[in-house]
């Protein structure tokens, strides 16, 4: 991708009035926050404004937490896959070829993350690394 764009997927009145021609440009990554409830409309708008239905897309639910889940598909099937998986907010939707790198770059696997370790002398916890690092 040559650029990245962040956009909100939910406006106060419930509309998603975005600059779709700008968002649907090739060779860019689009990240949409607060858009899970309108995901079918969002995917349809990308396709209507020129992105191929086969464009990689994914949703990250509860990113970087122990409850993180990732659903990867294409624009044509993402909304249904997300419904089938029961994905809920908070989540980010990512659209663009960068999503195709997910299998290679899936560095975050919640079950592999270290658990918090209490430090009795400090009254805090170490989440990554070891006490004394």
Question: What is the role of each PLM region?
Answer:
Residues 3, 8-133:
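A contiguous loop/helix-start segment that scaffolds small-molecule binding in enzyme catalytic cores
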